[in-house]
Structure formats: C-alpha cells, structure tokens
Amino acid sequence: MNNIFSKIELAFISLMHQKSRTILTVIAIAIGIASLIVIMSAGDGLKSTVLSELEAYGSDVISIETKIPGKRPVESASEMSLGVTTITTFKNSDVDAIAALPNVENYYSYIIGQEIIKYEGNAKGVMVFGYGANSVLFEKLKIKEGRFYSLEEEESIAPVIVLGGSIKEFLFGDNDAIGQKVKLRNVSFRVVGVMEKRGAISGFDMDSMVYIPTLTMQKRLLDTDYVMGASVSVKDIDKIDQTKEEIIELLRERHNIDDPDEDDFEVMTMVEVQNMVEVVFSTITLLLSIIVAVSLIVGGVGITNIMYVSVIERTFEIGLRRAIGAKRRDILWQFLLEAIILTFLGGVLGVIIGIAVSYLVYLLAISFGINWSFNVSIFSVIMALVFSVSIGIIAGVYPAKEAAKVDPIEALRKE
C-alpha cells in the first residue's frame, strides 16, 4: 500500500515540475467533462419537466391530434405560430362520436390560435387556447383568482375567458380582473378567472395565454366546426388499448381512409406519449454526449503527445532512476499514473464546473419563468469521472511503455 502511495506522490511531484503544462491539460479535460455534465443535466432536467407535465394527465388518457398524412403533429409554439399545418377534417361530430364509445368516460376538444387581446388602451398578442370545460379534469389548470368556465357556459357559447398570470398583470396590473371585459377580434369577453403562473413548457409560455371555451372560439371568433385535437379518459384502463383501436377505426371510417399511411390524425395513449418523450430526450442527450466524448478522445490524443514529449525531455531522469535500481514497471507506473492524475483532476474540476453551470442554467430558466428541473444524477457524475480516467489510462499507456523501454546507459550517455 505504501508503495502505491509513494508512486502517486512521485507522479504528483513530477507534474508539479511542469506546472503550466499540467494546468493547461487539466483545464482542457475539465472543459470537456463540464460540457458532458451540463448536457446530461439539461437533458435529464428537460425530460423530467416534460414528463411531470404529462403525468398530470394520468395513464387512463388517450390523446387524438390532427396531422398532415405521413407527417407528425405540430409540437411547438413556433410551429403553431408559423401555421405549419391546418387540418380541418377533425370535426365536432367526430369528437361526439368518440365520446359515445362505451369505454369513454370524460373528454374535451381543443383548438389553438393567435389573437390580439385588448383592454382599454392596452393590447398584446396572445396564444388563445380554445379548451373544453372538461380540460380541468385532465390538466394542471390551477386557478389563482375566480374560476374556470363551466360546461354550461361552453354549451351556450358564452363569451367568457380565463387569463394567464402574465396577461392579467399586463392588462390590469394589481387591479381585480374578475368581471372585467376584454376584447378578442372586437368580441367582448367577460373575465371569469386568472391562472396560477406555470412558466414555459415545450416552447409555450403558459402565463401569456388565455383560455376560452372550444365552441365559443369556433363560433364567435373563427366560424369553424373543426378542432385540432381531443383528449379522452377511459372507464376501464385495462381496455385502453382496445379503446384506442376503436377510435382509430372510427376516425378512418368517418374520414374515408383505407390506407393507414393516409391517416390525418394520430392516436396515442398517455403511456405511449411518455415513452416516446423518454426515447426522444434520451436519444438527443446520447448524441450530444457522443459528440462531447469524441472531443474528449481527441483531447486524449493530445495527452498522449504531451506525455510522449515528456518522456523525451526526461530521458536522463529515467536513465538515472533505472541506474539506481528502479525497474521497468516502476517507470511505466510513474508515467501512467501521471496521465491518470491529469485526467482525474480534470474530471473532478469538470464535474464541479458542470454542476455549477447546470445550476446557473436552472436559475436562469426559473428567472425567465421556464419550468425547469435541476437534475445532476450520481450516475452522470460517476460516468464522467470513469470516462475521464479511462482516457488517462488509454492516453498514458503508449508513452509509459516507451518510458519503460529507455535503456539507462544510453539515456545517461546522451545527457
């Protein structure tokens, strides 16, 4: 044991004699490891945030979304605002037919658009969520002031509106908004509620949105009878897959679709959505981590070159140590330990920097109202350190072997 510690001490002393080279190498490794930690933390944090939102729906929910045949549904606020797709085939009558299926318990449909909201002299562009009144049974729609609109108000096409927290502050400041009238497309809406602040989710600023009944949006603003999607909950969760297939068959029949590739809708259970999100985020995190890992491997080649130059520069030292009794394996271990110590120190420093940067990203996201999770797992820290030390071992083997091969007589003669 003492022999091992003496070898480590000797390796440290040798590295301290080359402070500039040691510091630069440690910093280079630290930057790579820090990048790896930040990427893994950001990926895990974002995945946790999205999954926590999806879990609010429960495992008994089926989602139906419109899409262009052969393509995926719209997934972000930027796509929505650019009008990437407008499918008009999913009608109110389709939703009613789905609701009539024997295993469907509750449901709501939705349509989303952009409008200018006005109150006295204030005006602002907002995302308008035409949501069914039953949406409160599915989503985390928490009311801070007032209430959410009722099913009766939706059925009567009542001009009622629920404001996001930021919109309420913009239009009314500290004044009470409940009962006040705001305008969308010159149609007056009575404010019945104000949402609690939720931050941003998947590109949507949830606090800069307003909610009105689906039918109200269709009839009073858009003059349409189609929706963008719907969610249904089932009575018997054991039959959820069967109900999903019934919905698919029903919509294909109503839309006259024979080829599944021509589906203008997508039906997924919430469990499938959660699994898909996990796969997508895990894949993105893995790909980015591989890119960083490649850069670290390139850094390992640099360490090999540095250590090889060090062997050449320290030929006399190696020869002298061999002459006074050091064995080949002693020389090999010294140079190998130097490479391992370099990468281990770089790994530890990188982990510390990575955790600090990840926490700063978390604080920055929170300050901008983005719903974000700070998540640095023990697994990612251990993996980063193991990868860092592995690079040191691999990078140090060749120069260490070359150092062990040095002939002591030739080394002393050259000096």
What are these regions (language model features)?
Residues 2-4, 400-415:
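Short cytosolic juxtamembrane segments of multi-pass membrane proteins
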Residues 5-16, 20-31, 35, 286-362, ...:
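Transmembrane alpha-helical interface segments in multi-pass membrane proteins
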Residues 9-17, 43-47, 51, 272-288, ...:
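Alpha-helical membrane-interface segments at transmembrane helix boundaries
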Residues 44-127, 170, 218-219, 242:
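Hydrophobic, regular-secondary-structure patches
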Residues 100-106, 176, 226, 408:
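Glycine-centered tight turns that cap/initiate beta-strands
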Residues 134-148, 158-258:
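Mid-to-C-terminal secondary-structure elements
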Residues 244-247, 258-292:
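Peri-transmembrane interface segments
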